Amino acid sequence: MGIKIIANNKKAYHDYFIDEVLEAGMVLLGTEVKSLRLGKANLKDAFCRIMGGELYVNNLHISPYEFGNRENADPTRARKLLVHRAELDKLARKVDEKGLSLVPTKLYFKEGRVKIEIGIARGKKLHDKRQTLKSKEADREMARALRDRH
């Protein structure tokens, strides 16, 4: 079956340095899965938080399923993520020690199951964002020059 990407969080790569990523499963309702199969998700303002010894993703917007009924849930509700206890403990240590954040970077189907990729992230300063944009623009200019030359 492979991997089918539902949504990417491009803003996360703009606002953060992503040091490490890990994959987690999600606890969802049936109508949410149906909506995700239609590609109706937005990771833009999403973030992860450890509450009560469990990992949750907040502000992940999954649009209500249009053919659903009263079972449709709140589009931005907190959803539990499924990770191994050792991974959760490691994440908790890193977030507490170094002031890092947990940011969802990608939402996808893997062998029929919804997975979310979580990045351990450090915030970028304004000058870091500008530097990233300059380097991307320089790479684009070089690629354009090479393409035009041949």
Swiss-Prot record:
Pfam families: SmpB (PF01668). Its main location: cytoplasm. CDD domains: SmpB. GO terms for molecular function: RNA binding. PANTHER family: SSRA-BINDING PROTEIN (PTHR30308:SF2), TMRNA-BINDING COMPONENT OF TRANS-TRANSLATION TAGGING COMPLEX (PTHR30308). Required for rescue of stalled ribosomes mediated by trans-translation. Binds to transfer-messenger RNA (tmRNA), required for stable association of tmRNA with ribosomes. tmRNA and SmpB together mimic tRNA shape, replacing the anticodon stem-loop with SmpB. tmRNA is encoded by the ssrA gene; the 2 termini fold to resemble tRNA(Ala) and it encodes a 'tag peptide', a short internal open reading frame. During trans-translation Ala-aminoacylated tmRNA acts like a tRNA, entering the A-site of stalled ribosomes, displacing the stalled mRNA. This is SsrA-binding protein. The gene is smpB.
